[in-house]
Amino acid sequence: VRERMGFDDGVPSALRDMGVASVFFEPPTHAPDLTFDLVFLGEMNRLLPFVPLLQSIHNAGRTLLLVGDVPEVLRAQLPASVSCTGRVPYTQVPQQLRRARFGLNLVSNIEPYNQQTSTKLLEYCAVGLPVVSNDYAWVRYFAAHYQGNFHLLRDDPSSWQFSFGEALEAYPYVVPDVRELVWPKLLAKLAIWKHLHIVPE
């Protein structure tokens, strides 16, 4: 980033990755109502290339909840087993995620997306959801670094119905501990504070 933007003035700086809001770590106020098999959170336009995969979820007899605004171009292609919440206040997102048994992480396997931190995956982990994801570079790095085990889907469409069928239940998921990624802790670790002679609270 420094090289591409021409930041060569020697001003102290720090690179900060994405974190998770504290609200995602708060225990639920009541027992979750597990209405759905899978939940997807994020920018819905990015789901358009994955419509065939969403159809495989439907064909496997599974239900999916989309949390967020769904554009009409996508809504028109959704199978009947997909439900949409519409826009949800940020503080209510954890409650919506807990309505499902698995978090669905879908990211186009092209740069720069396949190198970027998936905020939704961090939030799935924070609320304790096992994760199903397409296979790409960052998700493999994160799973190895944080000792997680995610159900990574193959690129072969003919395998998807099985992956969302009996394999969905049988996979040995491990949800990694991401408490160190809560925003206050993440920000407190930035080296920039030393240059500014500030001690984070």
Language-model region placement:
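Nucleotide-sugar-dependent
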Residues: 45-48, 91, 105-123, 133-142
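A short alpha->beta transition loop at the rim of the catalytic pocket in nucleotide-sugar-dependent
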Residues: 101, 126-128
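Acidic, glycine-centered active-site loop in nucleotide-sugar glycosyltransferases
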Residues: 79-80, 119, 140-155
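Glycine-centered short loops/turns at secondary-structure junctions
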Residues: 61, 128-129
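A charged, aromatic-enriched C-terminal amphipathic alpha-helix characteristic of glycosyltransferases
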Residues: 154-200
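Donor nucleotide-sugar binding/catalytic pocket of nucleotide-sugar-dependent glycosyltransferases
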Residues: 1-27
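Short, polar loop motifs at secondary-structure junctions
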Residues: 1-3, 67-74, 135-138
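Conserved catalytic-core segment of nucleotide-activated headgroup transferases in glycan assembly
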Residues: 19-26, 31-77, 83-98
